[in-house]
Every structure is written in structure tokens, then in C-alpha cells.
């Protein structure tokens, strides 16, 4: 599952950070379910901010199970006026899912610093 949203005329910085907080508050639940979320918060032109998920990887789960797991998050976002367009896919194998979700990429640069974090339960 992949999606993105950002600040705009209808999404204030305050609303954006409330949405990020709603995601962060659910880390223990998503971690316990064995999910892997590859995401970033980015600063754009002016004071624009964006959040991108590329992808939300849920090994050993069906798409229906992942949608059920994330339903409350997407409801909270909808209540905040955020309805990201979600790209979904389901795969028969770990390798197939990994290959579809994690393209090779250049990481980091002069204005970007990439880091990984492990959040304990």
C-alpha cells in the first residue's frame, strides 16, 4: 500500500502534524502485526510539507487484513479532511511483494539525510 498527502489550502500545518501523530500513535499496533512502513516527511517549496508512504509492507497478511488493521487510521485522517489516494497490491510471495514495493533508489543528497529507526514495542 502506497500513498501521500501534504499541506495545502485545505490541510494546515497543524492538521498535517495531527495526521502524523495519529500514525505514530499506532506504531505499537502495526509493529505487533509484523508490518513494515517505509515512509518519509519532506519539506517542499516555501513552507510546504508532505508525508509519503512507499510502501506499507505487511508480510503474512492479506490486503483485506491490512485494510482492517489501518481502518481506524484512515478514518481519523478522513475526520481531519485528509483522504490520500491509496495504491494497493497483494502478492503471493514475500519476494514478489518486496520487488513490487521497494524499487532501487539513490538515497540521501545535499538536502536530504536518510535514516532508519527501530521503534521498540
Task: Give residue spans per PLM region.
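Soluble FAD-dependent oxygen oxidases
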Residues: 1-121
Amino acid at each position: 500500500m502506497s500513498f501521500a498527502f501534504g499541506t495545502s489550502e485545505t490541510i494546515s500545518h497543524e492538521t498535517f502534524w495531527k495526521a502524523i501523530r495519529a500514525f505514530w500513535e499506532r506504531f505499537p499496533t502495526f509493529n505487533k502485526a509484523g508490518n513494515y512502513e517505509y515512509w518519509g516527511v519532506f519539506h517542499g517549496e516555501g513552507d510546504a510539507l508532505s508525508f509519503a508512504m512507499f510502501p506499507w509492507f505487511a508480510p503474512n497478511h492479506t490486503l483485506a487484513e491490512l485494510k482492517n488493521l489501518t481502518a481506524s487510521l484512515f478514518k481519523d485522517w478522513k475526520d481531519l479532511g485528509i483522504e490520500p489516494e491509496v495504491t494497493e497490491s497483494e502478492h503471493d510471495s514475500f519476494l514478489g511483494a518486496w520487488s513490487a514495493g521497494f524499487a532501487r533508489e539513490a538515497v540521501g543528497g545535499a538536502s536530504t539525510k536518510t535514516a532508519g529507526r527501530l521503534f521498540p514495542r
